[in-house]
Amino acid sequence: MKEGRPHIDNPLKWAISGKICCNGLFTDIGTGLEQTSEVNLKTRRVVKIDGKNCGSQSALGHHLSALWVTPSMDRLFAEGAAGRRRFVDRLVVGLDPEHAARVTEYESCMRGRNKLLKEGAYNKEWLSSLEETMVTSGVALTASRMGMIEKLNKITREQYGVFPAAELGMMGKLEGWLFDVPAIEVEDKYRASLLDSRQYDCHS
């Protein structure tokens, strides 16, 4: 791993690079700040893989991932489920970078649906389109979360010792359905559930 030093004329310039070996194949990766303006010292993030510029830093997720727990997260298992789901999402993204896009897509469509329902007068085709995206993205991301939980449970079961192994699980409507029926049937059930709950959700 090689770390570049800041330039004296512009301390904002910075870069770090390294060589990763996976299954005997080496990949050069690097990231840093590149100056875009001589006038106001503006910079932008640059990511390179094997010497080629990448469109975004998400490309790094196809080669490596990192996860950490900070002191501010020590209430993770004592507070609401939303924070724990976000933490599981970070674990999933470490193995499947596309998961982040599915989460963003689902949350964006959910907010759009809630807004349309609260406004009262809405285009039914547009509302159905938002719900359809919620169905496909929601079931897919829930299945990915459950898959990650099962991976963690498998690891804890393989640990030998006198200390009891932790058993993790996720509880929710989609999670419960996915335990019982195939994903395609869960999509049908979720689609019908969203349709049936429109009247209730517009007042919630």
Residue ranges and their predicted role:
Residues 2-83, 89-99, 153-158, 186:
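Nucleotide-state sensing region of NTPase/ATPase domains
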Residues 75-76, 94-98, 104-106, 196-200:
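Short, surface-exposed, polar/charged, turn-prone segments marking secondary-structure boundaries
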Residues 83-84, 148:
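Short phosphate-engaging motifs
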Residues 88, 95-145:
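Long, non-coiled-coil amphipathic alpha-helical linker/lever segments
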